[in-house]
Every structure is written in structure tokens, then in C-alpha cells.
């Protein structure tokens, strides 16, 4: 854990159906110095916190029941009643196959963390979303953090349509 961040003023929302997993994430956040931690057990109970605008980071499980973490992410990024469309969202899941990573990325997730995870793994995702936030992109069919992690030189014709 190289970079030091003061988490005492960061407001977290953890959304997970599994009480033990929610408590584990909460305990890790507390160990890192977080004190403002809210827990929600499902999509519907998370909406109140998300609509209030008093959340700085959302950590959600992909496999929420009856509505998924992706549906929650869609609410955050695209619903008119979402208080913060730029809210950093860390997606937790045991589904670490590339298709899940790509689907999360394409839905606008800020970071992805596969289970089982370590405290250091969560810490690194938190540093990424808090200390090194990415620019957001709004194009037809996508609103979310810039999916490019690095700028690579391009050697070719510019084929993008002029806006």
C-alpha cells in the first residue's frame, strides 16, 4: 500500500446481498480509516442513498438479487434521478471471466475487483478511483469513465466522424 489516502471523509456505499461479504468489505474500509460506511442489501435499498447524493464511492456486487449490480450501475450512470452520474463504482464479483470484465467496463464501471480479493487489492482500486480519477466520456450508447487506460500512438487515418 504505497499511496496514503485519508479515507475518514470519504462516504462509502457497499451494496451486497451477502451479509458476510458486506461486513468483510466494511471491516476492510474501517481498517483503512473509513468511518462513513453505509450498507445496502439490494438494488432498491441502495437507491435512497444514491439519490441523496451523499455518497463518494459505491462498491457493489455484480450478482445482486433480484436486480443486478449492472442494473444499479445503469441507474447511476443513466437515470435522471441519479444524484451523481460521475460516482466512482467498484464492481465486485466472483465472475472474473473476461466477458464479465468487458460487460462491466462497457456499462461504465470505474474499477473491477474479482473475488476472492485482498485488502491491498481493494485499497489499490480505491486509490485509483479517488487519487487518479479518469475523465468521463459521453458518446452515443455510452456514458462513463474513459475506457482507455493509456495513450498509445496511433499511426493511421482518422476515421472518426466530425462532431
Language model segments and positions:
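CheY-like receiver
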Residues: 131-163
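Alpha4 helix (beta4-alpha4-beta5 surface) of REC/receiver domains from two-component response regulators
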Residues: 26, 71, 96-111, 137, ...
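Short amphipathic alpha-helix used as the core "switch/output" element in two-component signaling
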Residues: 63, 68-84
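C-terminal output helix
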Residues: 117-130, 134, 138
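A short, hydrophobic beta-strand element within the central beta-sheet of small alpha/beta folds
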Residues: 73, 83-96
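Two-component/phosphorelay signaling modules centered on CheY-like receiver
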Residues: 19-43
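Acidic, metal-coordinating helix/loop segments flanking the phosphotransfer/catalytic sites
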Residues: 39-57
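Active-site residues of response regulator receiver
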Residues: 61-63, 93
Amino acid at each position: 500500500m504505497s499511496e496514503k489516502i485519508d479515507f475518514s471523509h470519504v462516504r462509502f456505499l457497499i451494496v451486497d446481498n451477502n451479509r458476510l461479504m458486506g461486513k468483510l468489505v466494511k471491516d476492510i474500509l474501517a481498517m483503512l480509516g473509513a468511518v462513513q460506511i453505509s450498507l445496502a442489501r439490494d438494488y432498491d435499498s441502495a437507491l435512497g442513498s444514491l439519490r441523496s447524493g451523499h455518497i463518494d464511492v459505491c462498491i457493489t456486487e455484480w450478482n445482486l438479487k433480484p436486480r443486478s449490480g449492472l442494473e444499479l450501475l445503469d441507474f447511476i450512470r443513466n437515470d435522471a434521478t441519479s444524484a451523481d452520474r460521475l460516482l466512482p463504482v467498484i464492481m465486485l464479483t466472483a465472475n472474473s471471466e473476461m466477458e464479465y470484465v468487458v460487460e462491466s467496463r462497457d456499462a461504465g464501471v470505474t474499477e473491477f475487483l474479482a473475488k476472492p480479493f485482498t485488502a491491498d487489492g481493494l485499497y489499490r482500486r480505491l486509490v485509483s478511483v479517488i487519487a487518479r480519477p479518469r475523465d468521463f466520456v459521453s458518446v452515443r450508447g455510452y456514458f462513463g469513465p474513459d475506457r482507455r487506460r493509456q495513450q498509445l500512438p496511433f499511426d493511421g487515418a482518422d476515421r472518426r466522424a466530425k462532431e
